[in-house]
Amino acid sequence: MAKKKSKDKAGSNTIAMNKQARHEYFIDDEIEAGIELQGWEVKSLRSGKVNIAESYVYVRDGEIFISGMTITPLQAASTHVIANPTRIRKLLMSRKEIDNLIGRVNREGMTLVATTMYWVRSWAKIKVGVAKGKKLHDKRTDSKEKDWNRDKARIMKSSLR
């Protein structure tokens, strides 16, 4: 009998994470989207040269775009391609998903935030979070709760000894 191929691969499929988004926003829902990339950008993503922390997602003319995402070109990139690391990139979603996002942004006053970028087979995907901004007191209560959970875990660990 033939061996079955293992689907587990060494390493992670995650390319980049926006940890700041969880601190700045209440993320209500996350939707997966494809990204329209050029060849040199895919090569840079494979080497992990991307930053989505300062990026933002917006709607224009019924389409979804991401701006502020920096993909640093490789040193060995070809000379005839002019690389723009911060160009505006189109996100690829179904019309139903786009209409849903447009409705939530316009009616409910929600914001679109890029949370995670990862590989699905050979395709680069990005998770777009539908979020609402946190106030300063919300951030304070979150940090207090996080500290308390850390202290609680420390106390439980020491009491088991």
Curated annotation (Swiss-Prot):
Name of the featured protein: SsrA-binding protein
Job of this protein: Required for rescue of stalled ribosomes mediated by trans-translation. Binds to transfer-messenger RNA (tmRNA), required for stable association of tmRNA with ribosomes. tmRNA and SmpB together mimic tRNA shape, replacing the anticodon stem-loop with SmpB. tmRNA is encoded by the ssrA gene; the 2 termini fold to resemble tRNA(Ala) and it encodes a 'tag peptide', a short internal open reading frame. During trans-translation Ala-aminoacylated tmRNA acts like a tRNA, entering the A-site of stalled ribosomes, displacing the stalled mRNA.
tRNA processing listed as a keyword: no
Gene3D superfamilies from the UniProt entry: 2.40.280.10
Family according to the record: Belongs to the SmpB family.
Membrane-crossing segments per the record: none
GO MF term list: RNA binding
Record region (Disordered): 138-161
Compartments where found: Cytoplasm
Superkingdom in the source lineage: Bacteria
Ranges of compositional bias, category Basic and acidic residues: 139-154
GO annotation, cellular component aspect: cytosol
Organism: Aliivibrio fischeri (strain ATCC 700601 / ES114) (Vibrio fischeri)
Keywords: Cytoplasm, RNA-binding
A single GO BP: trans-translation
